[in-house]
Amino acid sequence: MVSERIMLGNKRGKLLNQYVPNYVLYDLETTGISCNYDEMIEISALKVRDGVIVDEFDELVNPMRPIPYAASAVNHITDEMVAGAPVFSVVLEEFLDFIRDDVLVGHNINRFDMKFLYRDCERYFAQTLTNDFVDTLKFARLCLPGRKHYRLGDLAEVYGIPTEGAHRALNDCKMNQQVFEWLAKEKTSVPTTNEKEILCPECGLPLKKRSGRYGEFWGCSGFPRCRYTRNV
């Protein structure tokens, strides 16, 4: 049974778009891109305190199915590598005990990694993950507006961070952690977000109240790149 120390509950954590000095940065490798039927095959994480890595987590996972060639071509994880690995229900409990109630950080996790974690927490423990999280893809758009690409490798190149070993979870974590710390320095030149501002669930930028043909509505400040709207 999952430890009572692990932060599970009925309400998912919030998306933050700000720097935090203490966090767990994580990355997943999977058999594909769909959380409807794909499975995790590797999960890695770095525990960070005041911007410094203090602990690591790195586990391969046996998905109990063949890994598609297309996935192996990207992450270089093969069936032979995971044959003796534990199943994900075991690894997930270890991972949850590692992260505790820390803020989670990762690249594009709002649209990808968090969905897998929510799914499997609910699948194995009948509760969901309550940790707040920062998506460095959205944070980069806030700190470095106007760039054409915000892929992790592109951001790493901006700061001269080596990209060797990309697409293995632990290597991506180390790259992403450095990017996040550099973005935090960029953030000092970006106006502080009012805590009462509502963030766009699509891109993480603040929503602004606008007027249209049918009255007032909330629209993303990232328009026209992001066209998210909602009723007032």
Regions found by a protein language model. Name each.
Residues 200-203, 220:
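Short cysteine-rich clusters marking metal-coordination/redox-active sites
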Residues 182-198:
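Mixed-charge, glycine-rich, non-catalytic linkers/tails in nucleic-acid processing enzymes
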Residues 153, 197, 217, 223:
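Residues immediately within or flanking Cys/His clusters that coordinate Zn2+
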Residues 211-219:
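Short linker/helix segments within small regulatory modules
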Residues 2-118, 122-123, 127, 145-167:
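Conserved non-catalytic scaffold segment of RNase H-like nuclease domains
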Residues 224-232:
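Short metal-binding segments enriched for Cys and/or His
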Residues 168-181:
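Acidic, divalent-metal-coordinating active-site segment for phosphoryl/phosphodiester hydrolysis
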Residues 133-150:
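Short alpha-helix plus adjacent loop in nuclease-associated cores
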